[in-house]
């Protein structure tokens, strides 16, 4: 990497969430619990969907399996490093490690945004056009939609890395965060970053905003349809939509706030970052399965054979 070799900065210092040792120890235990919950919850959903053919053939559960896999991987990008930093004084990350965090965070984050938008469209078709649901959301279309989500995330993340890797770093190297993210890294560059900031805002900020608006529009149409055509279980659907919108808002609102504005340093940014890196990956398994009878029944049918492979009873 020529830019990395030309730069005087070979590592970044992460200021983290707190400088108090007592608070860091408490945060370590708290986020360790969160991380275990994220891994177990999302892994259980992935295994359950894969172990039951009827769930895997359903568009909703097919997308849910991919969402849980993304959340599982997304938490692994930042949380293990954060947990390790809580237990040591020096919190640093190499330049290449920083680029890796940026790449995987934006790859998985953008893929999740696209997938949540696809899932909203899936629910729109299921509720507003139920007679043609299985025809419209056929397996081939579902596969192509998921591939499009992953490809979109890949393209988005590559663009972020290209913008950052070309910047020269020759001075301060402190990031007021618990991981490397584009806004804080760009502000450390020893050059005018106005054009780069505009490109990142256009790439990340507008992406978050457009996906969020599409989601809101889809759920608005769903709610209007439910009010116009009363059907059995309407209250349950309303409640489920409200839960989904809550989780979606916890992902998109912080992203819009962080990326769709000039890159001024706010200490609250790292608090907002916790929502889409820790909180929502932990809440998604609860929100998407707590009210889902089919998923809960399928989980109860899982049994563990002596070899350790989960299979349906």
Curated annotation (Swiss-Prot):
This is Olfactory receptor 4Q3. Odorant receptor. Residues 50-58, 122-140, 221-236, 291-313 are cytoplasmic. GO terms for molecular function: G protein-coupled receptor activity; olfactory receptor activity. Glycans are attached at residue 8. Disulfide bonds join 98-190. Pfam families: 7tm_4. Gene3D superfamilies: Rhodopsin 7-helix transmembrane proteins. The keyword Nucleotide-binding does not apply. It comes from Homo sapiens. It is a multi-pass membrane protein. PANTHER family: OLFACTORY RECEPTOR. Belongs to the G-protein coupled receptor 1 family. Residues 1-25, 81-101, 160-196, 260-270 are extracellular.
